[in-house]
Regions:
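N-terminal secretory signal peptides that target proteins for export/translocation
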Residues: 1-7
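Generic secretory/membrane-interface signal
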Residues: 6, 17-20, 150, 308
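Bacterial N-terminal signal peptides
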Residues: 10-24
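Extracytoplasmic metal-acquisition and chelation regions
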Residues: 12, 25-338
Length: 338
């Protein structure tokens, strides 16, 4: 072997080692900045991979982050679609019948027609209620006059960690050859969501104490967030959200908002903004410049098109609306010890 080759070989080894180290340390940042997932099965390239179905965009994104490209993933309720108005498509039944694992939220989040498809499938697929398993003692809220379990557990990143762990455990059970990969990815998700939790607390703490009041069209969906970060939730707009309210009801809501002295009210992405704008004008408050993502993730290319980005986008909307100081979330590099 020539002296030149002997000289360059150790340099090459050093370069590879440095590259691997940098990739491991920067994974958390890359995970946060990764592009949005697709909402359809990926087609020809992975047709022989185990088929997995996820019902909503939050669970779908977490499955994608845990599993990477080891499964053929089909996502049913697209980002931006109100789950209550979702109608199963022709291919949904086929995807459910062919799936090895079906991940759904639970706590009655899925519309009845979709839930019946899942429960009625006869293929022996594992049917995993991710939110129910992750958070067995959920918060309660009043719906149609009854106290029921609140399904929107993902609005607290600590619950997001538990959801990722449920997904990872069940993928590992069904596809044991990839268990190491799933466990490693889940640890990376956990590290980043813990960082996000700290960042959200700091941003909410920057809001003046007198403004830490939350009025939104779908504040029931944000209960896990408001409770975790000590925002007083004032359930006013729920009374007129997505219904045709009477003038008397509008006046009642306007009075309640004025009493609350909030500077800004919030609209979520699935609500009708016309009535809310009328209420805001009469109550002399602002409507937040950005919509909240309460029911699902943002559409591909939007600010909230992954789980982590949704949490940061909602936090920005709330902090800026209530007079706090918004600073961009910058995930810290975490070394990969595996």
């Amino acid at each position: 072997m020539s002296k030149k080759l002997l000289l360059f070989q150790p340099l090459r080894i050093i370069f590879i080692a440095l590259t691997v180290g940098l990739v491991g340390c920067n994974y958390v940042g890359n995970l946060f900045n990764s592009p949005a997932i697709t909402t359809e099965s990926s087609g020809e390239s992975n047709k022989n991979l185990p088929k997995v179905v996820a019902t909503n965009s939050v669970i779908c994104d977490l499955v994608k982050q845990v599993a990477e490209k080891t499964v053929n993933l089909t996502c049913l309720i697209s980002p931006g679609v109100d789950p209550d108005r979702y109608q199963p498509k022709a291919g949904d039944r086929q995807a459910i019948e062919q799936a090895k694992i079906i991940f759904f939220n639970g706590y009655n989040f899925e519309p009845t027609n979709l839930f019946k498809l899942i429960k009625g499938s006869k293929n022996g697929a594992a049917k995993i209620a991710v939110a129910q398993r992750a958070v067995p003692k959920p918060l309660l809220y009043r719906k149609n006059g009854k106290l029921v379990s609140n399904p929107y557990v993902w609005h607290h990143p600590k619950n997001g960690i538990k959801m990722a762990e449920v997904i990872s455990a069940n993928l590992s059970k069904a596809i044991p050859d990839n268990a190491f990969l799933y466990g490693r990815n889940t640890q990376k998700i956990k590290k980043q969501l813990n960082q996000l939790d700290v960042w959200i607390k700091l941003r909410i703490d920057s809001i003046p104490a007198k403004n830490r009041k939350f009025v939104a069209t779908n504040d029931d969906a944000m209960i896990y967030y408001t409770k975790a970060y000590n925002l007083a939730s004032i359930n006013a707009l729920e009374k007129i959200n997505n219904v045709k309210p009477t003038s008397g009801r509008i006046k009642e809501v306007v009075r309640e908002i004025r009493r609350s002295t909030v500077p800004t009210i919030f609209i979520d992405s699935t609500s009708n903004s016309n009535v809310i704008n009328t209420v805001a004008k009469q109550a002399q408050v602002q409507v937040a410049a950005r919509q909240l993502l309460a029911e699902n993730l943002g559409k591909p290319g939007d600010n909230g098109d992954t789980y982590q980005k949704m949490l940061t986008a909602n936090t920005r909307t709330i902090v800026e609306g209530l007079g706090g100081t918004y600073l961009i979330f910058e995930p810290q590099a975490v070394a990969n010890k595996n």
